[in-house]
């Protein structure tokens, strides 16, 4: 985003039910906004899997190190899942925001609401809806084909969708490219908001001297 005024980054939070397009859209956004947007990298205590790189896929730490990060307020939020800790490092997020780089979070509604409660000033939240439950069912069938799995995910999807009203924006994903375009428009608009233009006062002062 070329601009003579410096802007703070945002925390771009994207949620959708399984099959809604969140993962694909997130990958495309990172590719198309690569100078302005980075993927959130979590801290975890689990062992690295083959091919995973520390600092790219996760920040890998020991459990005592993780607990120390929590006790010293260096984690925005965290949880224990299947015996391993996962969390969002505060410094990674705040440093990027201060440098004008936005951070993308592709997370469920529970994680989204935690970030909204903690960092409301910086969060821009978007919920992605499927065009219809029939279309969502078709997408899930193409993934799995197992009726039990599909029915379970459709039930979960209805519950997840019921939380969309708290998001800043809601997009209906008829077409991936159109959805990416809409989110990029939101991204640009949010970055241009007055409260995020950190060099605005200096710019105005120079203009009216």
Curated annotation (Swiss-Prot):
EC number(s) stated in the UniProt entry for this protein: 2.7.4.8
Domain Guanylate kinase-like positions: 9-188
Compartments it resides in: Cytoplasm
PROSITE patterns: GUANYLATE_KINASE_1 (PS00856), GUANYLATE_KINASE_2 (PS50052)
Domain of life: Bacteria
Primary subcellular site in the record, as a coarse category: cytoplasm
Any one GO molecular function term: guanylate kinase activity
Gene Ontology cellular-component annotations: cytosol
Positions of ATP binding: 16-23
Chain coiled-coil ranges: none
Catalytic activity: GMP + ATP = GDP + ADP
Catalytic class of the enzyme: transferase
A Pfam family reported for this protein in Swiss-Prot or TrEMBL: Guanylate_kin
Keyword line: ATP-binding, Cytoplasm, Kinase, Nucleotide-binding, Transferase
Keyword presence, ATP-binding: yes
PANTHER family: GUANYLATE KINASE, GUANYLATE KINASE-RELATED
Purpose of the protein: Essential for recycling GMP and indirectly, cGMP.
Family classification: Belongs to the guanylate kinase family.
Protein name in the entry: Guanylate kinase
